[in-house]
């Protein structure tokens, strides 16, 4: 693959220092709200303070857009465009994980230091939310009429705990027959050092995330009996334990690794920015895939990109009120993350065969499937072009997200789902996500606003 010529970082699209200072002051107010979601709701005052900031910081948006709310605080602003035939969704979440005493600053008091803005949510994901809102605020004030497109800005209040915010929102969209041409959520970023041997920064745009499937595995005997009597070699707990052990032992042979298209593209499009011999290896995956796959399958983070992951998360059996009785029933919860459902269900047939041997039945109790987006399609190519325009110093590559986002909720109501925020992360910054000293480069905040303005105008 021909190596595109990258430019200097100084040629990025940016705002003036004065404008960027305004952005930092606004974002800091959002960071200072301790929007940590809890079931008991002890931070509701902080959430309310956060919600009151939105019309204060973005008055034109608040006056112009229609606001939808779902559940305990998930909100969606809707800007109706002129002659609109398309819908686009800019996503984020405003809940954050908590901080602790390992921070060098107060995690809920935005602090500027050494060219960075420290604070919980600066990366995950109050900066993207701020930039999305600010971009639309400015477009409205500039008289932009949003020709041909309705713009939705959605933000969940409980994404970090897999809450119901965006679940309720997508149920509403289904009911109203609203379908999105493209959804843009968190998940990818501008990174460096994440793939060994790459000589430049990369804008990694997730075109897919691994789906989630949960199964109840259960065994039941016709009769129990006292644990002191014979037959201890055949009870529900032992049967289930043998099933769990065998499935766990054979997982890698049941779900063999493969280079899925989006994973192959990640490495092939990075290859021009690698030196020998990595550029040769990853530029010719069809030739060297057996070698590369063998190496990657031995690295947990890498193997997650190539195969279905399986783990047993809960197990129970017998009657705790009468622990001397042999267990008549036992069950376990099996959790899987897959790249493609056909591979998942092919592997499940092998697991069911193991279950038959031990009298274990399986029932799917949750299916959370994600549909991959075509990285050769129009939506990805538009984002790719916007990134080359706004960040001409970075390579742009598709990738598979092995973590999770709220974007998966939109599988049934969106044609294209992309996971990317224009946060520029060094390797050290990347390590602060959900960890102490989360921070964003001060200059990067303005870059984010520029990107989202162009994204809205580009669609």
Language-model regions: role of each:
Residues 168, 226-254, 348:
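A short core secondary-structure module
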Residues 1-122, 142-149, 333:
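Acidic/His- and Gly-rich active-site-bordering loop/insert found
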Residues 117, 123-204:
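Acidic/histidine-rich catalytic neighborhood of metal-dependent amide-processing enzymes
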Residues 171-182, 238, 245-262, 266:
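Structural signature of cysteine-dependent C-C bond-forming condensing enzymes
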Residues 72, 105, 148, 179, ...:
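Short, solvent-exposed loop/turn segments at the edges of secondary structure
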Residues 66-68, 83, 192, 198, ...:
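An extended, acidic, His-containing surface patch that forms the Zn2+-binding/catalytic region
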Residues 94-95, 247-252, 352-360:
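A common structural junction motif
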């Amino acid at each position: 693959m021909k190596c595109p010529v990258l430019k200097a970082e100084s040629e990025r699209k940016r705002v003036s220092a004065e404008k960027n200072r305004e952005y930092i002051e606004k974002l800091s107010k959002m960071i200072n709200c301790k929007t940590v979601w809890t079931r008991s709701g002890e931070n509701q005052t902080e959430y309310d303070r956060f919600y009151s900031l939105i019309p204060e910081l973005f008055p034109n948006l608040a006056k112009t857009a229609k606001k939808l709310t779902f559940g305990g605080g998930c909100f969606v602003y809707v800007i109706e465009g002129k002659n609109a035939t398309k819908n686009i969704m800019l996503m984020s979440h405003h809940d954050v994980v908590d901080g602790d005493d390992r921070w060098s600053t107060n995690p809920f008091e935005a602090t500027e230091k050494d060219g960075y803005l420290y604070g919980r949510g600066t990366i995950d994901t109050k900066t993207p939310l701020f930039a999305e809102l600010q971009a639309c605020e400015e477009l409205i004030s500039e008289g932009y009429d949003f020709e041909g497109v309705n713009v939705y800005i959605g933000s969940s209040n409980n994404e970090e705990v897999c809450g119901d915010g965006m679940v309720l929102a997508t149920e509403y969209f289904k009911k109203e027959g609203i379908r999105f041409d493209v959804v843009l959520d968190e998940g990818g970023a501008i990174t460096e050092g994440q793939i060994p041997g790459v000589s430049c920064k990369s804008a990694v745009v997730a075109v897919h995330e691994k789906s989630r499937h949960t199964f109840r595995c259960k065994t039941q005997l016709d009769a129990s009996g006292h644990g002191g009597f014979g037959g201890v070699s055949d009870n529900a707990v032992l049967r289930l334990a043998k099933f769990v052990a065998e499935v766990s032992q054979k997982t890698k042979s049941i779900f063999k690794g493969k280079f899925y298209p989006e994973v192959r593209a990640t490495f092939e499009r990075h290859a021009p920015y690698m030196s020998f011999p990595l550029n040769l290896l990853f530029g010719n995956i069809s030739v060297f895939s057996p070698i590369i796959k063998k190496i990657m399958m031995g690295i947990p983070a890498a193997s997650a990109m190539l195969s279905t992951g399986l783990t047993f998360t809960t197990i129970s059996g017998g009657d705790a009120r009468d622990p001397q009785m042999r267990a008549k029933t036992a069950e376990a919860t099996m959790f899987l993350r897959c790249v493609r459902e056909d591979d998942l269900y092919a592997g499940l047939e092998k697991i069911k065969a193991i279950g038959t041997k031990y009298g274990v039945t399986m029932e799917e109790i949750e299916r959370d499937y994600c549909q991959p987006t075509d990285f050769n399609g129009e939506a990805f190519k538009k984002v790719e072009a916007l990134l080359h325009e706004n960040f001409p110093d970075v390579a742009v590559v598709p990738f598979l997200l092995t973590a999770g986002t709220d974007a998966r909720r939109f599988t049934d109501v969106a044609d294209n789902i992309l996971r990317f925020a224009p946060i520029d992360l060094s390797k050290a910054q990347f390590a602060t996500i959900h960890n102490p000293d989360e921070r964003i480069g001060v200059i990067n905040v303005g870059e984010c606003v520029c990107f989202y303005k162009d994204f809205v105008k580009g669609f």
